[in-house]
Amino acid sequence: LLDHTDATLAALKRLRAHGISVALDDFGTGYSSLRYLRAFPFDRVKIDAAFVGELPSDEGAGAIVRAICNLCQAFSLSVTAEGIETDPQRVFVKEAGCSFGQGYLFAAPMPLESFMAYLDQMRAA
């Protein structure tokens, strides 16, 4: 993103113009940057599993998750917590302000056909 800011911004705007939501993945690690929240038209931020995996026992990870949720709320962005594996993690991220969660607590990665069957099963429940 940093090397091609103008091209990236134009591409993201085109995607959004076609009704495609854009997420900033793995936020809080690697090359993700606070600057991206202001510079690019994201709809959602995905909190990296590295923080979620330490919840709820690691106070530092908890503080980071809460801070990301608060920051995203200020920018009107929805938040997804990645890597939820336990119910205490689910409860923590929900209380912190995460709108969505993903991880093995809900389901393992699966091919499209299996996902469609899973989705039908969830709708019927």
Predicted regions and their residues:
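Catalytic-core regions built around general acid/base machinery
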Residues: 10-18
